[in-house]
């Protein structure tokens, strides 16, 4: 069913629509209007939509694990919370698999691209590689390289990635674990996303080089 022939609502009643239908027709004044409205829009909507993406998977089925991705994410974050980890690490635990279903083969990069501008180097690095580190804990899985993580041994963030995966990822599939509700983590997510974003082109280049080496 198609959407009705009308504008989508504006977030604020005093905001303006840009009536032109093609970006190439936008004038400088139009871009000034959009740019003035962009920052407050993201400030209000970014975290809301991230959390909604996770919350909407609350009742999703699983393809064999005893918990779905929502419960796995909550368990991971709850374990990090109860271990007294910093807020950033708890938020990373909550969202490390946010793309597991919609972007399964690149879900580490999905999470890193979502969070990377707001988190430390160690967590950006870990997120991009955590799926490969997880293979170490699947000794009888036939379709992965259990020693794939060894290519990065000696890297400053190797031990954190190994620790995160061992304690808060591969061990977070318990159907009777007493998870904290999502609402507990919402203020933490807001505070992380409220940080001044810092682009990470060097990490994108590093991961691209890793991928090129894997296919060469």
Model-assigned labels for residue ranges:
Residues 1-94, 98-216:
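Metal-dependent phosphohydrolase cores
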């Amino acid at each position: 069913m198609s959407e009705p022939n009308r504008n989508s609502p504006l977030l604020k009643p005093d905001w303006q629509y840009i009536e032109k239908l093609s970006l190439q027709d936008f004038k400088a004044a139009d871009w000034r209007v959009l740019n003035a409205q962009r920052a407050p829009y993201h400030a209000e909507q970014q975290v809301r939509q991230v959390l909604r993406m996770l919350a909407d998977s609350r009742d999703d089925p699983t393809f064999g694990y005893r918990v779905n991705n929502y419960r796995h994410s909550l368990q991971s974050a709850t374990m990090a919370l109860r271990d007294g980890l910093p807020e950033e690490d708890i938020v990373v635990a909550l969202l490390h698999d946010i793309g597991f279903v919609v972007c399964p083969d690149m879900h580490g990069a999905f999470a890193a691209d979502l969070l990377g501008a707001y988190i430390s180097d160690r967590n950006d690095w870990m997120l991009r590689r955590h799926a490969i580190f997880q293979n170490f804990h699947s000794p009888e899985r036939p379709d992965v390289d259990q020693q794939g993580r060894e290519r990065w041994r000696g890297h400053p963030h190797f031990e954190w990635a190994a620790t995160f995966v061992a304690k808060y990822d591969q061990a977070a599939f318990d159907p009777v674990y007493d998870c904290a509700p999502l609402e507990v983590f919402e203020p933490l997510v807001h505070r992380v996303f409220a940080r001044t974003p810092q682009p990470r082109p060097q990490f994108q280049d590093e991961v691209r080089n890793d991928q090129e080496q894997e296919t060469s």
